[in-house]
Amino acid sequence: MNTPLRVGIVGCGVLANAMAGHLARQPRPVEIVGCLVRDPGRARGALPCHGSWEALLAQRPDVVVECAGQAALAQYAQAILAAGVDLVPASVGALADDALRGALLEAAAAAGARIRIPSGAMVGIDGLAAARHVGVAEVLYRGTMPPVALQRYVSGPLPERGLAFAGSAREAVARFPKNVNLTGTIALAGIGFDRTRVEMLIDPDATANVHELLARGEFGDFHARVSGLRISESSPSSRIVAGSLAQAALGSGFLALS
């Protein structure tokens, strides 16, 4: 296929640049048509930047990947979808907001666009989605991270070691908006934000972000585990997240939100 895939990005940080690097190495030609940032003059990196969603959409992207946080997804996603452009959100946790999710689905349906949910830092998302058709009774996500991966992104004290949080996926994405977007993907693939249980643990000896997914139901049960190295010390995201965003942008390996 010789026609370049035109990709727009919301954000221009570490995750966005890592994903763009993966896209640049694909056999299919890919053109990054621009990044949407608050202040194009302060943007770092070599990617072209725009200061408004109108300017980004004027570049005629085939797909837009959001890499800028839950607030950015809430601000720009509806306009992107209403323009008939597919959206790949990194900040899937924002979709715990039922009103926002409903508005985005309505905009996508009206314009013939899709919301492509990436697998993120976890394996087994496709299996969980398949198991849902048979019957899923319980889903648990357990994340174990070094203190630096959590402490700078939340307000309030956290323990030095051990259990930092236990609750629903809906509660988790509110408590850790930059760290547990993966739980949003798991909730959407499985049994929802209120029934999906989340445990967050801190381990000062950890050298990677460890993600575990446990599910049980009429299909049987499974336990998936990923030990993901972070993109950099300045980013809470695992390296595989950038790969999953690139894969979803290219048109495979994603959950179509409906």
From Swiss-Prot:
Pathway: Cofactor biosynthesis; NAD(+) biosynthesis; iminoaspartate from L-aspartate (dehydrogenase route): step 1/1. InterPro entries: Asp/hSer_DH_NAD-bd, Asp_DH, Asp_DH_prok, L-Asp_DH, NAD(P)-bd_dom_sf. The active site is at 211. NAD(+) binds at residues 121, 181. Belongs to the L-aspartate dehydrogenase family. GO terms for molecular function: aspartate dehydrogenase activity; NAD binding; NADP binding; oxidoreductase activity, acting on the CH-NH2 group of donors, NAD or NADP as acceptor. Pfam families: Asp_DH_C, NAD_binding_3. It catalyses: L-aspartate + NADP(+) + H2O = oxaloacetate + NH4(+) + NADPH + H(+); L-aspartate + NAD(+) + H2O = oxaloacetate + NH4(+) + NADH + H(+). The gene is nadX1. The keyword Nucleus does not apply. GO terms for biological process: NAD biosynthetic process. NCBIfam families: PRK13303.1-3, PRK13303.1-4. The iminoaspartate product is unstable in aqueous solution and can decompose to oxaloacetate and ammonia. Specifically catalyzes the NAD or NADP-dependent dehydrogenation of L-aspartate to iminoaspartate. Its EC number is 1.4.1.21. This is L-aspartate dehydrogenase 1.
